[in-house]
């Protein structure tokens, strides 16, 4: 659990259980949801078959999205770069900056060297992982460039790798 700044949880932090208790609670939750027909398809999401959140799947597949409105985030792939943007967080600042023609408060260009990490950080949240072709289409890089690191993670029991799919193992889902 991450207690985000500027939230009620950060202001009034609850007492959190110890590691083993957390693991036991997670296993109990997963078992109960599985018994009700819900699969843990993503690190923090459960759904019945065919009911997964398509909006979030786009994030985890490193797809593009355009955020509109105060505090909204975007990820945009252009022909020569990938950008992450954040609109002005506070509505009054957002409106003022829209009028001035500067709706973006922060913009980060993701360098080509950072794309493998960005992609894997998202795609390995999914229990089903991703096909290697998706990596190549979303990063414009060959999977061979990261294959040694993927094979090392497989040797550590964190990934299952086949020609069709790269996915976290149950152990990998706990630690990746």
What are these regions (language model features)?
Residues 1-141:
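C-terminal scaffold of the Radical SAM
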Residues 43, 146, 163-164:
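Residue-level detector of family-conserved "landmark" positions at structurally sensitive sites
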Residues 140-155:
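Short amphipathic alpha-helical interaction segments
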Residues 154-164:
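A short, conserved structural fragment
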Residues 162-176:
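Accessory beta->alpha helical hairpin/"wing" motif in late/C-terminal subdomains of nucleic-acid enzymes
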């Amino acid at each position: 659990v991450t207690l985000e700044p500027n939230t009620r949880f950060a202001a009034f932090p609850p007492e959190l259980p110890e590691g083993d208790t957390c693991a036991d609670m997670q296993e109990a939750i997963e078992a109960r949801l599985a018994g009700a027909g819900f699969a843990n398809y993503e690190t923090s999401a459960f759904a019945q078959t065919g009911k997964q959140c398509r909006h979030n799947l786009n994030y985890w597949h490193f797809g593009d999205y355009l955020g509109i409105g105060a505090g909204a985030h975007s990820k945009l792939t252009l022909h020569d770069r990938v950008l992450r943007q954040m609109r002005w967080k506070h509505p009054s600042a957002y409106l003022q900056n829209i009028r001035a023609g500067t709706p973006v408060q922060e913009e980060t260009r993701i360098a080509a060297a950072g794309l493998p990490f960005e992609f894997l950080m998202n795609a390995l949240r999914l229990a089903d992982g991703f096909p290697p072709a998706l990596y190549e289409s979303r990063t414009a890089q060959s999977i061979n460039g990261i294959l040694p690191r993927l094979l090392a993670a497989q040797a550590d029991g964190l990934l299952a790798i086949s020609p069709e799919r790269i996915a976290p193992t149950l152990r990998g889902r706990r630690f990746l």
